[in-house]
Design a protein with these regions (language model features):
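Short beta-strand/loop motif that positions the catalytic acidic residue
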Residues: 147-149
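Catalytic histidine-centered segment of alpha/beta-hydrolase-like enzymes
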Residues: 183-193
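Short alpha-helix in the alpha/beta-hydrolase fold that links the catalytic acid
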Residues: 134, 157-167
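Conserved small/polar residues in nucleotide/adenosyl-binding loops
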Residues: 209-215
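Acidic catalytic loop of the alpha/beta-hydrolase fold
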Residues: 152-156
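Catalytic histidine neighborhood in serine/cysteine hydrolases
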Residues: 168-182
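Alpha/beta-hydrolase-fold enzymes
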Residues: 9-104
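Short, proline-enriched alpha-helix->beta-strand connector loops that line the catalytic pocket
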Residues: 140-145
Length: 217
């Protein structure tokens, strides 16, 4: 922490909620239920549990969006058809979208990696190692913080982010906070969100105006 002049935690939390853990468990179970997973030994056969990994990605992708955003983008629109097929094909656009996102993911990610990364995220608890909780964790901080949340993010909520802000304030840290009003959910930080970009630029400009960088030798 002493080596960081400033930090911008974006759409995060100090630990996963029960809902976060539950969503990750759904993803893990989808992978492990795929017969190709073979207790993680699929790598020895040079194969990938594609179906399980695709479903895991679908679960994750839903959590990155918002209900309003999904409704406005997809609603109940059908996928290139005039009426229901009364089958298990993708009748709705949102079904087709999820399938595309799921199976595109398997080409660039590894199933075992998802298991371990989600497990590590679930175990992470910033306050656990400090008896005083988050306030103690942030004690004697010299880093300048900007915490940013998104109003429609239900994965890492505004409350999750405000809890960090409250703890930083209580510890005497230099912290500012901004909630970006948007219907794009958790994925907002990856998208063209003008207010988000303006907030970042403003913080960086003010933070580094009078900063003297060390001379390189």
């Amino acid at each position: 922490p002493d080596k960081a002049f400033s930090a911008i935690p974006i759409a995060c939390s100090s630990s996963h909620s029960a809902q976060n853990i539950a969503l990750n468990e759904l993803a893990r179970q989808a992978i492990m239920a795929d017969p190709v997973w073979d207790n993680g030994k699929y790598v020895l056969k040079n194969v990938q549990p594609k179906n399980g990994l695709a479903v895991a990605r679908m679960v994750g992708h839903i959590s990155y969006l918002s209900e309003k955003g999904m409704q406005e983008k997809f609603g109940r629109k059908l996928q290139e058809k005039a009426d229901y097929e009364f089958s298990f094909n993708a009748d709705f656009q949102v079904e087709s979208y999820l399938r595309h996102q799921g199976y595109a993911f398997v080409e660039r990610f590894d199933a075992n990696s998802v298991l371990y990364i989600t497990r590590a995220m679930d175990y992470f608890d910033l306050s656990k190692q400090f008896k005083g909780g988050l306030v103690e964790a942030f004690k004697n901080q010299k880093t300048k913080f900007l915490i940013i949340s998104f109003s429609s993010d239900w994965l890492y909520t505004t409350k999750d982010n405000k809890d960090i802000v409250i703890a930083l304030n209580a510890s005497g840290a230099d912290v500012s906070y901004s909630e970006i009003i948007t219907d794009k959910g958790h994925d907002s930080f990856l998208l063209d969100e003008p207010e988000f970009l303006k907030t970042l630029k403003g913080f960086i400009a003010v933070s580094y105006t009078h900063l003297t960088l060390p001379t390189m030798r």
